[in-house]
UniProtKB/Swiss-Prot annotation:
PANTHER family: AB HYDROLASE-1 DOMAIN-CONTAINING PROTEIN (PTHR43433:SF5), HYDROLASE, ALPHA/BETA FOLD FAMILY PROTEIN (PTHR43433). GO terms for molecular function: bromide peroxidase activity. Disulfide bonds: none annotated. The lineage of its organism: Bacteria, Bacillati, Actinomycetota, Actinomycetes, Mycobacteriales. It comes from Mycobacterium tuberculosis (strain ATCC 25618 / H37Rv). One of its GO terms (cellular component) is membrane. This is Putative non-heme bromoperoxidase BpoC. Substrate binds at residues 21, 87-88, 120, 239. The keyword Cell membrane does not apply. Belongs to the AB hydrolase superfamily. InterPro entries: AB_hydrolase, AB_hydrolase_1, AB_hydrolase_fold, Epox_hydrolase-like. Keywords: Oxidoreductase, Peroxidase. The active site is at 87, 211, 239.
Amino acid sequence: MINLAYDDNGTGDPVVFIAGRGGAGRTWHPHQVPAFLAAGYRCITFDNRGIGATENAEGFTTQTMVADTAALIETLDIAPARVVGVSMGAFIAQELMVVAPELVSSAVLMATRGRLDRARQFFNKAEAELYDSGVQLPPTYDARARLLENFSRKTLNDDVAVGDWIAMFSMWPIKSTPGLRCQLDCAPQTNRLPAYRNIAAPVLVIGFADDVVTPPYLGREVADALPNGRYLQIPDAGHLGFFERPEAVNTAMLKFFASVKA
């Protein structure tokens, strides 16, 4: 394992949060960490390999990132831990429960999938070609694409709400790095749903109704494959639904974790 940059707050039962592609550990700090700390949990967030303050490594795979998360849980001696993941982070959590089930007591998977459908295969291929071409999009166009990919129509049609995101995305455009390019490939390369039928831990899968990156029907497939899977869909939310609808998402996660054994 490389040196992962992580934050560890609180003293209750541990919850490990795994961010999506391009997201640093601080992704969870505006909304989820305060809610979980208030509920008495210990919150561990970290920068995935290739992003943030963690070494900007390259040449890694999904298996490498799964091993990183496993090593963090083992190093902190917090197994079995509750785990929360979104998008790529949810996929990492799923694969972790396949190879090291003893490390995870229960999990919440948001905006996830166990396979790529035809549209998502094409989207990934197109994004890989953009990265590999070396073309850097103008910040405003990059912001436009991120808005359309990540938010619901409700947010996009709200002048106040969308204005804040326009400003943020325009000021902080995505920079192409080897690490971010590797993260793009940290997605299902085959249909992984059959493997998930052996996961015994209780899992809540949360889908976001307006998600075009990982549409909710793909998340429902994961829940259906899990022996102890549950599914919940949040309305008026896109791929970043945990930012758009934090109260609804946090309430669902905390209710779920309270209902299952640590």
